[in-house]
Amino acid sequence: MQVLVRDNNVDQALKALKKKMQREGIFREMKLRGHYEKPSEKKAREKAEAVRRARKLARKKMQREGLLPMKPKPVFGAGPGAGRGGPAAGPRGPR
């Protein structure tokens, strides 16, 4: 995998490399290959992933058909940290 470094901007090149690796699924594969996974565990994990995908597809289909309410869009400034320390406050209070 190659990434061009323009104007000695290594940070930008590193960001592009990480994005490519994420798209290719390299990080996920490294995590899975970090330790041995028994064939039975692999089968169970893949089955659970398939069930999750099927549920997600069914949920999206029901939302499109109007049988389920759509997920509310996040409103900035009205989240869990609103009113505690200004705009820089996150979920754990002011910085």
UniProtKB/Swiss-Prot annotation:
Biological process, per Gene Ontology: translation
Protein name per UniProt: Small ribosomal subunit protein bS21
GO terms under cellular component: ribonucleoprotein complex; ribosome
Keywords annotated in UniProt: Ribonucleoprotein, Ribosomal protein
Matches recorded under InterPro entries: Ribosomal_bS21, Ribosomal_bS21_CS, Ribosomal_bS21_sf
PANTHER family on file: MITOCHONDRIAL 28S RIBOSOMAL PROTEIN S21, SMALL RIBOSOMAL SUBUNIT PROTEIN BS21M
Sequence segments annotated as region (Disordered): 56-95
Family assignment from sequence similarity: Belongs to the bacterial ribosomal protein bS21 family.
HAMAP family tied to this protein: Ribosomal_bS21
GO molecular function terms listed in the Swiss-Prot or TrEMBL record: structural constituent of ribosome
Annotated coiled-coil segments of the chain: none
Gly residues: bias regions: 78-88
